[in-house]
Amino acid sequence: MVHIGAPRDARSLTDEVKSRARRYGSDLVGIVSASDLDAVPSHWIGHRDYRCYTKKTTHYLEDARSLIIMGIRVWDDVFETVIRVRDHDEYPEEWRGQYYARRLVRFLEGEGCKAVLEPDLLSKKRMAQLAGLGNFGKNTLIINPEYGPWFRLRSILTDAELVPDRPFTDDLCGGCDRCIKSCPVGALTPYRLDPDRCLLGMTWEQRRSKEFGKIWDEHCPPLTRNTYLMCMTCQRACTHGRELRGLD
């Protein structure tokens, strides 16, 4: 249903977007202007599902103006489960976040705006830092002062004119390198992850190999024949968000 009446001003619409995002289930929400994200140089994404360079917002929406970045807290190990389906992994926690974001997309469309759910070649981590959600940590995750690394990101690109938030500029890592030292396979160096070395980036054959099999079973314990917990070692090592996660 398209909104009828005078269009909202940017501040009013921004406030409504943030209110709805929290009401739908997000714990964190921030706004980035499309031009600010596009000003970030294209960089390599070593994702578990694809590896390529980031794109500009106009790759998805010619008249893109704003990005909404949502942070959904993961407060229990159940949110870190992975299901092996035939020859690939599925992450049930992603479905929850996508549901919250999809509801916000429907609201924007009802306001007469265009909205793209999860433009996958735009860096959600860069969005999160630009939107003030946290800093890019040495474990390559976004670290929030309250939640630490224990939240997941969902994003929406829209032609709506929204009021951007201030970037996060504090350094929450400082001289700490606990996450780097904790990695069982040495996949981390400061602010960089080797996706081929990371347990979650390995092929199924590598995970069951003589070299990595025992490490895999220790850090990605099986729950059923086809379900396991993803490795959280570098997250557990982080000093931020520990109390809320029940680690202290």
Please name every model-derived segment:
Residues 79, 85-248:
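Catalytic cores of enzyme domains
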